[in-house]
Amino acid sequence: MAALKALVSGCGRLLRGLLAGPAATSWSRLPARGFREVVETQEGKTTIIEGRITATPKESPNPPNPSGQCPICRWNLKHKYNYDDVLLLSQFIRPHGGMLPRKITGLCQEEHRKIEECVKMAHRAGLLPNHRPRLPEGVVPKSKPQLNRYLTRWAPGSVKPIYKKGPRWNRVRMPVGSPLLRDNVCYSRTPWKLYH
C-alpha cells in the first residue's frame, strides 16, 4: 500500500512539473556548470548556507591535431603513454575495472588494443586498486592459494633466481612488457629493453 502511495505521489509531482513548465521546477532545468563557493550568512538565529557560482569555467581547449581519428591521436599521445599513466587509463575503463567498448571510447583499433594491454598491466601491478568488482554484502574473500606456476615437482618457495643465464653472446633473455608498446617514446639515453 505504501509503495502504491509513493508511486502515485511521484507521478503527480512529475505531471505538475510538466504542466507548470521549466520555470517552476528546479529539477527540469539543466544545472549550471561552474565553480561554486560556499557562503554562510547569519540572520538572527538562522544560518543560511548557499553555494554561489563564482566564475564560469573556460571553454575546453582545442586539440593540437583535430584531424586525428581518435582522442589519443587528436591530442598527440600516440606513443607517449604507458601502463603507469593511471589518470589516462581510468577514462577508458568501467568502475569495476573492465574496458569500455570502442563505440563509447571512440578509439581506433590500434590504440584500443594498446590501452587494453596497459589496463591489464596496471591491474597486475596493483595501480588500479579501486577498480575491481564489488563483493556481495557479507562475503569475506578467501585467501588465494599459491599455485605452482612453474610446473615442477619442487615447491614454488624453494625456487631460486637464475643469476647466470649463459654467456653474453648466447644469453637466454626473458620478455618483459608488451610488444604493442615497443614503439613508445623513450626519454632516457638507453633504448627500451624488451628482453631482460
Swiss-Prot record:
Domain of life: Eukaryota
Protein's cellular compartments: Mitochondrion
Keyword line: Mitochondrion, Ribonucleoprotein, Ribosomal protein, Transit peptide
GO MF annotations in UniProt: small ribosomal subunit rRNA binding; structural constituent of ribosome
Gene Ontology terms describing biological process: mitochondrial translation; translation
GO cellular component, one term: mitochondrial inner membrane
Transit peptide residues according to the UniProt entry: 1-34
PANTHER family, per the entry: 30S RIBOSOMAL PROTEIN S18 (PTHR13479), LARGE RIBOSOMAL SUBUNIT PROTEIN ML66 (PTHR13479:SF66)
Family: Belongs to the bacterial ribosomal protein bS18 family. Mitochondrion-specific ribosomal protein mL66 subfamily.
Miscellaneous comment as given in the Swiss-Prot or TrEMBL entry: There are 3 mitochondrial isoforms of bS18 in mammalia, localizing to 3 distinct sites in the mitoribosome. bS18m (bs18c) binds to the same site as bacterial bS18, mS40 (bS18b) binds to a novel location of the 28S small subunit, and mL66 (bS18a, this protein) binds to the 39S large subunit.
Assembly with partners or alone: Component of the mitochondrial large ribosomal subunit (mt-LSU). Mature mammalian 55S mitochondrial ribosomes consist of a small (28S) and a large (39S) subunit. The 28S small subunit contains a 12S ribosomal RNA (12S mt-rRNA) and 30 different proteins. The 39S large subunit contains a 16S rRNA (16S mt-rRNA), a copy of mitochondrial valine transfer RNA (mt-tRNA(Val)), which plays an integral structural role, and 52 different proteins. mL66 forms a zinc-binding site with uL10m.
Name the UniProt record assigns to this protein: Large ribosomal subunit protein mL66
Gene symbol of the encoding locus: MRPS18A
